[in-house]
């Protein structure tokens, strides 16, 4: 199976559509994964190579599958904001057009691209994003003689944390939050260090802080989601599935389950609420979860 990734690259009410002379078609930017590359990293790289723009990833749109001469091909598409850059013709793409949102489907050549664009247009382009991470591996509790709050990452856990340090910046987070346990903080400390920021401790998002006042914890999570830019939140396996499933239920978003492996992340996209929203308002006025995509690992798949 051929793995590939691409994006709906957008700015100011328009999306980028590229012309590929090899196929003489108009397409969304996409391409095959390089060896040792994750799907999100491939999406960002392919956008840069084909369009010249630095992409900041947003929500996962869909996975499409089709047959090519070399066999089945699977492409994951993300929404992506064009943060900076300029187009220059290159070996793969000889023309780029910025097309109004509503007109892009008329230009692309493939029906699969039209389906991806339909998904993109179903929600506002400018959504709020939270990357909800389960802490990396920290060995077995029974093998740690000290306070469990201080149980450190294992060697495998540090490798997972290094993968997250490379992966999570693709969404350009501006803040890093964590449950207070050492293994949660250390899982995302590298991301915070690269931002030159401190990890913001969130006691309500630990297992011992969440369940005694679940509603207050969910409200705190939504407050984080409503911040400027994307946020990273590191928490625990006893909390994350309930956060995701509860917010999905509130948003009317169907899910096929809420897996939560150590070192994994949920990419959550929220429709922004009206300014001045309050928890005293009806929950229909809160940030609304409109997309949830599970990233089972930050490490490249062999």
Annotate each predicted stretch with a short phrase.
Residues 31-33, 42, 126-212, 241, ...:
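Active-site-proximal alpha-helix that buttresses catalytic centers in soluble enzyme cores
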Residues 64-87:
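Active-site-adjacent beta-strand/loop module that shapes the phosphate/pyrophosphate-binding cleft
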Residues 130-131, 227-238:
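Generic beta-sheet signal
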Residues 87-124, 295:
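NUDIX/MutT-family hydrolases
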Residues 159-175, 197-200, 207-229, 245-302:
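Acidic, low-complexity terminal tails and accessory targeting/binding regions
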Residues 1-28, 130-135:
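N-terminal strand-loop-strand
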Residues 54-63, 195-203:
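A short coil-to-beta-strand element that immediately follows conserved catalytic motifs
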Residues 28-60:
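The catalytic Nudix box helix
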